[in-house]
A protein has these predicted regions:
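Chalcogenol-based redox active-site neighborhoods
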Residues: 1-144
């Protein structure tokens, strides 16, 4: 999101020549995502930078306006780049879709974290079921 509204961000613009810590959540404003996952990365963004991360990004299969509002509500926008995978295309390309139809949420992203170094996946952590452990910022920091 820019001051002038939504702006698409391409893969190369986000990942080429950079080391990016990206984490994905099933839904903005959901309990675990809002109380633990996003705040963990917001609070420790500087530690990630100190370990060689150029960009910290949060992604969800939500629209850009929801992601922008969620980032503002969590004081994340200065530390974490909030990314909307509105149609779930990036999530599908990774093969990390989650069928949350039973909760009325449709197709979403599994909870995961990854480090992409110059366009190549360096670290990938995917949670089992409804867990929140290996995709946390603390777990990633220990891996770096």
């Amino acid at each position: 999101m820019t001051d002038k509204g939504p702006k698409p961000l391409g893969y190369s613009e986000l990942f080429e020549g950079k080391r990016v810590a990206l984490f994905a959540v099933p839904g903005a404003f959901t309990p675990t995502c809002s109380q633990q996952h996003l705040p963990g990365f917001v609070n420790k963004a500087e530690e990630l930078t100190d370990k060689g991360i150029d960009t910290v990004a949060c992604m969800s299969v939500n629209d850009v306006f929801v992601m922008d509002a969620w980032g503002k509500s969590q004081n994340a926008n200065e530390k974490v780049l909030m990314l909307a995978d509105g149609n779930g295309e990036f999530t599908a390309a990774l093969g990390l879709q989650l069928d949350a139809s039973g909760f009325g949420m449709g197709s979403r992203s599994q909870r995961f974290s990854l480090v992409i170094n110059d366009g190549q996946v360096e670290i990938l952590n995917v949670e089992d079921g409804g867990e929140f452990r290996v995709s946390s910022c603390e777990f990633m920091i220990d891996q770096l």
